[in-house]
Amino acid sequence: MPTTGNYFHLHLVSDSTGETLITVARAVAAQYANVTPVEHVYPLVRSQKQLDRVLDEIEEAPGIVLFTLLEKDLVSRLEAKCQQINIPSLSIIGPVMQLFEAYLGASTAGRVGAQHVLNAEYFARIDALNYTMLHDDGQMVDGLEDADVVLVGVSRTSKTPTSIYLANRGVRTANVPLVPGIPIPHQLEVLKKPLVVSLHATPERLIQVRQNRLLSMGAESGNENYVDKQSVTDEVAYARKLSAKFNWVMLDVTRRSIEETAAAILKLYSDRQRQRLPE
């Protein structure tokens, strides 16, 4: 295998920012823990002159070449050079575009960097992020009705990171903590538009996460109830009781990552939106 020591060169050539390439390449490279990729990222490659400089660098440090180029002349030149020096190359978007063309019966418009045009979707994400940051952890409850999704749950059920993840997908997300002995906001009780999702985890999992949190903060005494099994069990029961009372969707996050939790919520939200469409 053409590697040096325990690493290999990974060349990422893009006619745009290269973000798509980086995401895909790192996701795949992470599956090979015994070797480390040395990334060479070449964004905004849109001319023969720019590509020639890239090819010189690739030849100096041969390795895997991944690319997202739409200009056919550039693609042909890159592939020919890689074949000449006997290194693998692959278009990340080429097979996907071919599939689209075959199904839709239409060819691509060939717009370089089209995925990064500042459009309505981009501004929706910015709006969602602004809303989510302002409505984190029970803040500004008067604006809850303007949310797409409201997350509720006891401490350490990943409400905030999940909210931010959803906001990055353009979903306006608020979150409200559920604390025994503290009444929930009236605004939460009377919500009509938003999807309310109650995040749950087992007491054992919550205790583990909370203990790790205390250790990271250097906290010692004064937090007995926070990690006491009976107290945490009571919190979970309280949250479940409220969820049943207000008919909130309950989602167990005990064994879910943030991404998995967000994906489940996005599906719930999408299903709900479809149900509301006029027939």
From Swiss-Prot:
EC number: 2.7.11.32, 2.7.4.27
Binding, ADP: 153-160
Its job: Bifunctional serine/threonine kinase and phosphorylase involved in the regulation of the pyruvate, phosphate dikinase (PPDK) by catalyzing its phosphorylation/dephosphorylation.
HAMAP family: PDRP (MF_00921)
Protein family per UniProt: Belongs to the pyruvate, phosphate/water dikinase regulatory protein family. PDRP subfamily.
This protein's name: Putative pyruvate, phosphate dikinase regulatory protein
Pfam family, one: Kinase-PPPase
GO molecular function, one term: protein serine/threonine kinase activity
